[in-house]
């Protein structure tokens, strides 16, 4: 678990070697706009699927400029980087070093590709497919897609046992958010289990949100006390014809959040809002008040 207030330069993990008995992690201090009470903001993107597209500079710059100017704590990509070409290219577009902001990736169904096992290529570039990190007052958990285009090497049992151990290490009541490529459930109880006896009810661990992609739409739903949050693609727009955008989540000290979309491919745009045609209010001084929208 990467602790809050630090970043790793594209190395939040170490591959375990059976001959090595200790591992050192290089941590760099990083405030990321995290306030003293733990409140912060982060950026969510998904489904960029760049395996057969070019000219990504504009939307990548939009995200980089926003995270720098607004001091985002981190960027999370919830999967479908897409096939061998996308997996190899995306890390060059967006990584912790060139974004100057920690960026984390989930594995999606189209990121499980041909190899010894489905996530082999993903692991070689992006690291493990399940892990966690802290930012401010919240514990964030990254979990893998259950299956995809090729059979993964991990099983549901592997993820369950890791998740159970991860949750045992955090203070009781600490807010958690789970990132995955897809939604776990349509119901009010977010239960991850492998049989009738071995189950984790994430609601009991103060789950605030399940944040995902896969659907290619912008959609937020309250399921009991938990919000499910889906974000469409920032480079192509949504499957429902929604405008290209990335999501910003503003998290308070209790782990509760508000959300907004920031549109891509817009750069320093200014438009007159009022006066409208045929309506020109004049102040007592004789001046005309003009208001504008700036993006």
Give the residues covered by each predicted segment.
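Short acidic, glycine-rich surface-loop motifs adjacent to enzyme active sites
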Residues: 167-187
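N-terminal active-site segment of His-dependent metallophosphoesterases
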Residues: 6-89
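Histidine-centered catalytic micro-motifs
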Residues: 178-183, 208-218
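Beta-strand-enriched, solvent-exposed domains that form extended recognition/catalytic surfaces
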Residues: 1-33, 270-295
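Binuclear metal-dependent phosphoesterase catalytic core
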Residues: 226-295
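Extended active-site neighborhood of metal-dependent phosphoesterases/phosphodiesterases
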Residues: 3-5, 11-15, 87-172, 196-209, ...
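Active-site glycine-centered loops adjacent to acidic/histidine catalytic or metal-binding residues
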Residues: 47, 79-80, 108-109, 181, ...
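Residue-level marker for buried hydrophobic side chains located in beta-strands
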Residues: 42-44, 77, 105, 178, ...
């Amino acid at each position: 678990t990467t602790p809050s207030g630090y970043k790793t330069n594209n190395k939040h993990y170490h591959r375990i070697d059976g001959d090595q008995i200790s591992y050192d992690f290089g941590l760099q201090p990083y405030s990321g706009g995290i306030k003293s009470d733990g409140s912060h903001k982060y950026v969510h993107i998904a489904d960029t699927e760049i395996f057969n597209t070019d000219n990504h500079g504009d939307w990548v710059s939009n995200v980089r400029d926003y995270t720098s100017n607004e001091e985002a704590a981190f960027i999370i990509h919830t999967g479908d980087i897409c096939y061998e070409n996308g997996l190899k290219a995306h890390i060059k577009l967006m990584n912790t070093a060139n974004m100057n902001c920690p960026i984390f990736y989930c594995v999606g169904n189209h990121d499980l590709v041909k190899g010894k096992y489905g996530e082999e290529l993903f692991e070689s570039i992006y690291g493990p497919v399940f892990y966690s990190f802290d930012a401010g007052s919240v514990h964030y958990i990254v979990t893998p897609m259950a299956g995809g285009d090729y059979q993964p090497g991990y099983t549901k049992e592997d993820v369950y046992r890791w998740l159970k151990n991860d949750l045992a290490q955090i203070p009781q009541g600490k807010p958690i958010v789970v990132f995955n490529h897809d939604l776990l459930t349509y119901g009010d109880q977010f239960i991850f289990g492998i049989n009738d006896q071995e189950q984790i009810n994430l609601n009991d661990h103060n789950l605030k949100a399940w944040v995902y992609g896969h659907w290619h739409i912008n959609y937020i739903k309250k399921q009991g006390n938990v919000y499910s949050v889906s974000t469409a693609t920032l480079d192509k727009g949504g499957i429902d014809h929604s405008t290209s955008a990335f999501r910003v989540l503003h998290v308070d000290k209790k782990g509760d959040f508000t959300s907004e979309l920031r549109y891509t491919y817009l750069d320093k745009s200014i438009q007159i809002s009022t006066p409208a045609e045929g309506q020109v209010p004049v102040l007592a001084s004789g001046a005309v008040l003009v208001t504008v929208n700036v993006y």
